[in-house]
Amino acid sequence: MAHLIEAAPNPHQPFVVTAGVAVGAAMRELELPNKGPEAIVCVKDSEGTLRDLSFVPEQDSKFTPVPANTEDGRTVIRHSCTHVLAQAVQAEFPGTKLGIGPAIENGFYYDFDVAEPFTPEDLQKLEKRMKKIVKQGQKFERRIFASVAEAEEALKNEPYKLELIRDKGNVDPGSDEATEIGAGDLTGYYNVNPRTGEVDWYDLCRGPHVPTTKYIPAFALTRSSAAYWRGDQSLAGLQRIYGTAWESKEALEEYQLMMAEAEKRDHRRLGAELDLFSFPDEIGSGFPVFHPNGGIVRLEMEEHSRRRHINAGYSFVNTPHITKGDLFKKSGHLDFYADGMFPPMQLDGEVDEEGNVVKQAQDYYAKPMNCPMHNLIFASRGRSYRELPLRLFEFGTVYRYEKSGVIHGLTRARGFTQDDAHIYCTEDQLEQELTSVLDFIISLLRDYGLDDFYLELSTKDPNKFVGSDEIWEKSTSILQRVATKSGLELVPDPAGAAFYGPKISVQARDAIGRTWQMSTVQLDFNLPERFNLEYTSSDGSKKRPIMIHRALFGSIERFFGVLLEHYAGAFPAWLAPHQVIGIPVADSFSEHLEKVTGMLRDNGVRASVDTSDDRMQKKIRNHTTGKVPFMLLAGARDVEANAVSFRFLDGTQINGVPVDKAIGVITQWISSRNNKQPSEETVKKLV
């Protein structure tokens, strides 16, 4: 009935199932785990498609088990948990209509058309109901609808599901709606009571799902919010419930602890507390304003990056924020990215005194990307092979129309500044240039204190690409070699590339283990053709350059938010808006500290003295909360000895440090761009 491809049973080991036998039955024969974190929740066939354990192959087939504690396993658990949630909502709130409920990163959500917004008390009530459903061990049964009419009849009381059924075949495979409909059969999943055999609840869904609700060992509802049907503000308003589900109670608790820490580190909260930036309603959603404190941090970030780029051979350019629409027609952005662009402005039109149009207005757009303008710089004159590689770099502000529901502080904004580079090189230079770019990216990110990375390689979507198979295969092979040489973990992203070329993305883990996509290195076979970019080769012939898109931070704003959360607001001294604060024990010692901070300012250090009326202990508390890395205290003994006392954010202290020594320690710490917070332990070695 089934046999393992290798010798001993293993929850990750492929096995073969005989035609006509259910996968789950074959697994039981092999004694693969059905409980605990390694319980097999579904399988993956030879084409990479996830299948229910109830799946019956028509011919002998190989399958790979998917344990609960893998990313695929967790995704299936979370998707199944959305069905449990929706069943609970319709039981507790009769008359509720169902939207969609996909698994998302670290959790899930489900949208509902309900009379009133959900309250925290409602979520508690729903969790209790869900636990009862899980305890029942309801079976997930997949049923194929024989026709659209049959599906419509089954879901006749669910208007949003009916819309999805009628849209079958026209849904973006990458959208949340694709969870329920897409290519292949039109299917539903029925939750069957194991005791009575009766259907307790059902939903339109493609699956796969866990065998029974008992395979959902740990979950929690986290919050609710307003949402729009299919993410469109012009459509019906819905209520969304978010949750998370894991393979064990221990994994759930670990995640909840991480989320509690993440909440403390939320850059939006820290931005307000530390007076770094704000989002004024008068300006509009998704447009941050940096205050003086945040402006200093941003300036330091940009200046260090600028110096590193100059040393690495990049040429700085600058381009305008808006341009004629014809440029984005030429680049293809209006064909492929129009939904992500702000509406056009009509400019340059003229009318006479009688209102007759003398000159037609033209469409101008706020730029969503810098690359078309960089191509115009390349094409502004003839180029020789001797000029290549040509590396054009810009801190270029771009504007993208993000839906209001996805805007998230600095990490998902509508207006942001990219550290954007476009590199033009010959085919022979490509591998060396990619190696240099990747080394430069990792080195620069480490300068800012990130040091835990892995790479993701996005390869060709066979249904959506430009250029020949040969050039895709060759360039993908080069990217893979470059990534492998870096020594970093390489994770494949099959068919994940944009249509114009393969891509490497650099993923960074922060201080609490979260992953952020930081940098991208993208090959482009499309724009050099569209812009007819050429250079003169050594034999005098005209050739097309290869183009590399490269954004290191992604955007300055996003990177600012990532660093703010990574450091929990306590930026390294070289980035901190206030590097040194003088705190006198009494007012009479302020003059001594003014001299010390004056000498520090002469050395380029941001230093000042707190001369407020607050008591010393309150000043220490205030500046500890304000995350000032160096606090210098001075009392009678310090003044007499021409010394200061160090106070650090961790509460430790070093007393009686001579002023010259203190200034040397501080300037050395800052100029070396030390990313650790100073403390008694680390500074005492330098005193």
UniProtKB/Swiss-Prot annotation:
EC number(s) reported in the record: 6.1.1.3
Keyword terms, alphabetized: Aminoacyl-tRNA synthetase, ATP-binding, Cytoplasm, Ligase, Metal-binding, Nucleotide-binding, Protein biosynthesis, RNA-binding, tRNA-binding, Zinc
Leading EC class: ligase
Pfam families: HGTP_anticodon, tRNA-synt_2b, tRNA_SAD
Cellular component terms (Gene Ontology): cytoplasm
Keyword Secreted tagged: no
Gene Ontology molecular function: ATP binding; metal ion binding; threonine-tRNA ligase activity; tRNA binding
InterPro entries assigned: aa-tRNA-synt_IIb, aa-tRNA-synth_II, aa-tRNA-synth_II/BPL/LPL, Anticodon-bd, Anticodon-bd_dom_sf, TGS, Thr-tRNA-ligase_IIa, Thr/Ala-tRNA-synth_IIc_edit
Catalytic activity: tRNA(Thr) + L-threonine + ATP = L-threonyl-tRNA(Thr) + AMP + diphosphate + H(+)
Record note on cofactor: Binds 1 zinc ion per subunit.
Region (Catalytic): 266-572
Origin superkingdom: Bacteria
Similarity remark: Belongs to the class-II aminoacyl-tRNA synthetase family.
Assembly behavior: Homodimer.
HAMAP family linked: Thr_tRNA_synth
Protein name: Threonine--tRNA ligase
Lineage of source species: Bacteria, Bacillati, Actinomycetota, Actinomycetes, Mycobacteriales
Gene (name only): thrS
